[in-house]
Every structure is written in C-alpha cells, then in structure tokens.
Amino acid sequence: MKVRQLSDSQGLSYLHLVTLSLYAILLGVLVGLIDAVFGRVLIGLSEFRDHHLFYLVPALPLAGLLIVYLYQKFAGKAAQGMGLIFKVGHNEEDQVPLRLIPLVTVTTWLTHLFGGSAGREGVAVQLGATVSHAFSRYFKLPNASRIFLTMGMAAGFGGLFQTPIAATFFALEVLTLGQLSLPILVPTLIASFVASTTSHLLGLEKFSHFVSESLTIDLGTFMKLALLGLAFGLAGNLFAYLLSLAKKKVASLLPNPYYRVLLGSVVLTCLLLILWKGRYTGLGTNLIALSVDGGTIYPLDWLLKLLLTVFTLSLGFQGGEVTPLFAIGASLGAVLAPVLGLPIPLVAGLGYLSVFGSSTNTLLAPIFIGVEVFGPANAVPYAIVMAFAYLINHKTSIYGQQKMLEMQ
C-alpha cells in the first residue's frame, strides 16, 4: 500500500511529514540553544557599550579591520551571508559552510560592542539555516535542501525573536515571492515553536507591547490606514534601495575592503557620537521603546537610523537589518500618528511591522508579528496597512537573491 502523497510539487508523503516533524523538535532545541547564547551575549555587550559609549565607539574602525580580516581569512562562500542561504534554497549552491556560525556570531558581537548600527535577526536566520542544512544530507527527500533551509530559518527567527508563527510564515514566503511552501507548514511550525520555547527557558526575553484598545474601522479610518501603509511601504523601499546602492557605490569608490572599513568607519564613528551621543548605535531598541511608550521621538529619528544602518552595513560590518527596520518603522509611526489623529502606540506598532514587511517583501509574516508582539486586538488594521505597504513593493528587497514566482 502506497503512502498518500501530500504535495505533487514537494513529493512529500505523510511518512515524510512525520519524520520531518520529529526532526523539527531536535532542530528547535539546537537552534534555540544557539539563539539564546547569541542573543544574551549580544544584549550584554550592548548594555556594556551603552555604559562605556565614549570609550568603545571610537574603536569602531579597529573592530571593522578585525571583522574584514576574519572574513577575508576564513569566510570563503560564507561571506555571502543571507545571499548564500537564498542561493542554496534556489539550488544555485549546494553547501552552507558550518564556519558561518562562529564567524557571523563573533563579528556581529564586535559590530554591536563598538557601536555599529545593525540588527541581529538576519544573523539568527543564517544560524538556523546553517544548522538545519547540515542535517539535510542524511534525509532522502525530494528538494531536501530547500525544505531544511526553510525549517532552519523559521527556527532561527523564532528562537531569537520568540514570534514563532511570524517566523514560520517568514521562512515559508521569503525565498520566492508569491509562493508559500505549505506542504512543510507543520514541521516548520514545530521547529519554530520549539526554538522559541527553548530560548525562552534559557533566559532570552521576548519584546512585546500589547495594545488592548482596538481601532474601529470606518471609511475615514480605512483611508488613514491606507496612507500609513503607503508611507511605511515607501520607507521600507527606501531602505532596501539605499542599502543595495550604498554597497555597490562604497565598494566602487573604495575597492580595498580594509581601506573601505577603516576610512568609512572613522566617518561613521563621528556621526554616531555627534548625533545625540550614540542614540543611533546598536539595534535601535531604544527608539522602539520610546515610540511605543510615548517617549521623545524626533521627526528625523527614523531617517537617521535608516541612513546610519545603511552606512554601517555597506562598510562591511556584520549584523542583520530587521531590528533596525523595526526601529525605523516604529519611530516613523510615532511621528505620523499625531498628524492623523491616531494613537501613537498603535501607529508605532503598524510602522514596526510594515516597514519590515516592505523591505523584506513579505506579507503574512509582518501581520503575525503584529499579532504576536502587539496583540490581536488590531489584527484588521495590521492587515490593511500591510496590504498597502505590499502593494507598492514587489521587486525591491534587502535580499538581493530573492526570486519572484512567474505568473502563468
């Protein structure tokens, strides 16, 4: 008797699904452990930096030189970072070197210790994908490479950020626009939930700010939400466009990576210290907290964080883009909320999820981020804003290797 096929495209049977689900438990524990270590050390280093800002940030050029040396000496294919993950997912490459794990972890810690404006989530996605892909050779499954990458990406995202449903849909939709890998939904969800639970049990805390007051949707409110979606979509587009442009232009102007990071980070250091004494260093969680808690947000906070993050990453420093995107969106939302007469915490949350969605070309993941971080009371506004943000962005993405499903 043949086992029933779940998907013609994936060629998965129920037996495959059970096997993958059992593996997902092991994967979730491993990646959750790695995420907990990575995340807790990063938080500790960031707090240490904030207490010794004027001693550490001036050493950013030296940290940059060390990062470039480590990548030049040891990286090989791993230097492609998320680009390599996407290439493997599209069967354009067949290996993710395990050395990516210590390399991207240590260099991201260095970037944050010395004040670079960068994120962490992209690193966690790489860590999860690398761990999971290492096991794919032991499983005789059709399209095993993509399946295991997807599960690992979800575990990495979910373990660090502890939004397992959002992490699941991020991994399912990000590799190819317009295509959801639904046949592997269950094992991907299991991997993400187990990783999230593991990292939480190991002391990694989740950021959440529940907004209990729900917004009543009428025509006027709908139009305001549509305008917000377009504004946040443009901000996400701007980040993705400038990041791609800056990497090309800086590399063209300063082709030697050592000169590039040394000269560029001297300028970056001055900017980080001059502009409100380190306000834009690190992840941007300070801006997120100020935005949702009603603190002081300046009109240009979002733009300065955007530009300094682009500059940091274009020089060769390591770290993800996602948490700065959250900060950019939240601070822009805090600025726009009074203009439209809407609650600041809610609009900050809408910006938080939709600038991320626009920059990554994802639709479902940001909506679930809204639900898991800010609560389900405003799920409809999340969806409306995200729909309009997604409307104006179908090709620009922080992930240059992302593909689009061709319409038949």
Predicted regions and their residues:
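Alpha-helical transmembrane segments and immediately membrane-proximal extracytoplasmic
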Residues: M1-Q408
